[in-house]
Amino acid sequence: MGHTLAEKIIMKHIGGKDVKPGDLVVVEPDCVVVHDIYTAFLRDKMKKMGLTKVWNTDKIVIMHDHLMPACLEGDPRSLEAGYELVKEYGIRHFHAAGGIVHQLVPELGYSKPGDIVFVTDSHTPTYGAVGCFSTGVGYTEMAAVWGTGQMWLRVPSSIKIQIDGVLPPHVYAKDIILRVLGDLGAAGGTYKSLEFCGTAIDALGIDGRMTIANMVVECGGKAGLFAADQKCADYCGVDYEDVAWVKADEDAEYERVLTYKAEDLEPVLSCPPYVDNVHPLSEVKGVRLDQVFIGSCTNGRLEDLKIAANVMKGKKISSHVKCIVTPASNSIMEEAMKEVQMVVEGVYSAKAARSLAKKYNVSMPIVEEVNQVLFE
């Protein structure tokens, strides 16, 4: 019997031993990341556990992204804890205000095809876009990994999602994952590995795959995985021949299989009050909008900004609508400045960022450059 992609990655990390869904295994991750929401909690837990050193300073990353710039009274304590962890434990990889953690981890090369990565955040499955088994953990588990280099896993069962064909115009990766969420339900993927394949999936770029993998947690997914291909290898800077094994076996056994014709998909929206309340755009046409947000760890990449810019080109945002744009990382903002003109009346992005940066004395040179171009 063959194995799913999740099973093959886990097997690689336990010496090739055969596994099946439900098995409990202990793995050493290739990388672990903690962000600023949990640095103070992690530091306290490390002290309570009596951990005075970490297992591998090359495999531990701290990122400040959620609380930059600090807005609430308790935020500075969390940021300070991050710097203290760097000093106390000799952490070698530290990033502050460079972007959203789920963009930076693959962008900076901390996730590779066939890796296992843990992060203190629910949307960690994002890195499955590059064939990495990645999932979120709490700060207690993270403290244990820091000290021991080990984490237990229950091998997940897998759901195969196959989409073949060519996507219609104006149907994107977000429409794919929302359709899947609507079909599975908000709990339909609980502790499952959602594994995406098919010609329509193969045609997606890494940006689109990240959007899909990022959202599998919205149906309870443990991981969202894509097979490694040449696009993936090029993005990660690895030789494809070295990662060609990062794919499911043809005779892999799945708990469930969902199949779609790409041509049948259409633009959809996730409507209140639940993420699986998904409706075709045509059904909600005419609903008044008060605020539009373009960005986040789900849709803040260059491909997303290009699509949004093309939609808004030549148009004016209504006076009652606030439109906010937040690129997922500084490098994406820099690329967007070169390739995408987001000069649309009523858009709040760099202007608001400069005000916050000035208030909290945070240096953001790229924001200053954007403001000079757009507003001065």
Region roles according to the model:
Residues 334-376:
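NAD(P)-dependent Rossmann-like dehydrogenase/reductase catalytic/cofactor-binding core
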Residues 1-338:
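Fe-S-dependent hydro-lyases/dehydratases of central metabolism
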